[in-house]
């Protein structure tokens, strides 16, 4: 388990220490810096809902450095981002791959960013199943439907034709930050923090 730094603040009641992520949450900053799975999705969703309850009119920043992960867990984050009232700004640091890239596109249009050396990768969903032939057929139909849903959302969020997204996601499709801007996944490559 990684060591999480602590920060100490002086208040009128004395000193107060926070882990760094809790301190950043006070500034409405959420980090997704791991695989997207049920546990990380629950944490991100809880933080989004908490920040909405604190101030429904103030933007939330979601920093993404993720290799991707579970579609259903990612869709829980995606749906919550769209469900809550505050705009969610997305910022790619490092890499946003697969579901990480999908969530990067899900930020409020005009508020989707990447740092200059960030890397973005989109592709079709991965899956694997074993068992009886009928079960394999059921899972195959499900993953094909998920691929169709994801591609439609990416096309809508980026402004790319659906046919292009289908072709580009057929295999791993890597982009540098500027290429992701041209594609429509992000709106701007930034070198300094946006306030």
UniProtKB/Swiss-Prot annotation:
GO terms for molecular function: ATP-dependent peptidase activity; ATPase binding; serine-type endopeptidase activity. It catalyses: Hydrolysis of proteins to small peptides in the presence of ATP and magnesium. alpha-casein is the usual test substrate. In the absence of ATP, only oligopeptides shorter than five residues are hydrolyzed (such as succinyl-Leu-Tyr-|-NHMec, and Leu-Tyr-Leu-|-Tyr-Trp, in which cleavage of the -Tyr-|-Leu- and -Tyr-|-Trp bonds also occurs). Its EC number is 3.4.21.92. GO terms for cellular component: cytoplasm; endopeptidase Clp complex. CDD domains: S14_ClpP_2. Keywords: Cytoplasm, Hydrolase, Protease, Serine protease. Belongs to the peptidase S14 family. NCBIfam families: clpP, PRK00277.1, PRK12553.1. This is ATP-dependent Clp protease proteolytic subunit. It comes from Alkaliphilus oremlandii (strain OhILAs) (Clostridium oremlandii (strain OhILAs)). The lineage of its organism: Bacteria, Bacillati, Bacillota, Clostridia, Peptostreptococcales.
């Amino acid at each position: 388990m990684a060591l999480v730094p602590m920060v100490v603040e002086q208040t009128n009641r004395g000193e107060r220490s926070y882990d760094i992520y809790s301190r950043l949450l006070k500034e409405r900053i959420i980090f997704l810096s791991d695989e997207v799975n049920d546990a990380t999705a629950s944490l991100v969703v809880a933080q989004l809902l908490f920040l909405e309850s604190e101030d429904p009119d103030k933007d939330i920043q979601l920093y993404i450095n993720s290799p991707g992960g579970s579609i259903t867990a990612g869709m829980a984050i995606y749906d919550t981002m769209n469900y809550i009232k505050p705009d969610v700004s997305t910022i790619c640091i490092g890499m946003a791959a697969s579901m990480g890239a999908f969530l990067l596109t899900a930020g409020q249009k005009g508020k989707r960013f990447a740092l200059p050396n960030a890397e973005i990768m989109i592709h079709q969903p991965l899956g694997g199943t074993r068992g009886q032939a009928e079960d394999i057929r059921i899972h195959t139909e499900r993953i094909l439907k998920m691929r169709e849903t994801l591609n439609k959302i990416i096309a809508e969020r980026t402004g790319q034709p659906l046919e292009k997204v289908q072709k580009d996601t057929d295999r791993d499709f890597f982009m540098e930050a500027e290429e992701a801007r041209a594609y429509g996944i992000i709106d701007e490559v930034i070198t300094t923090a946006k306030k």
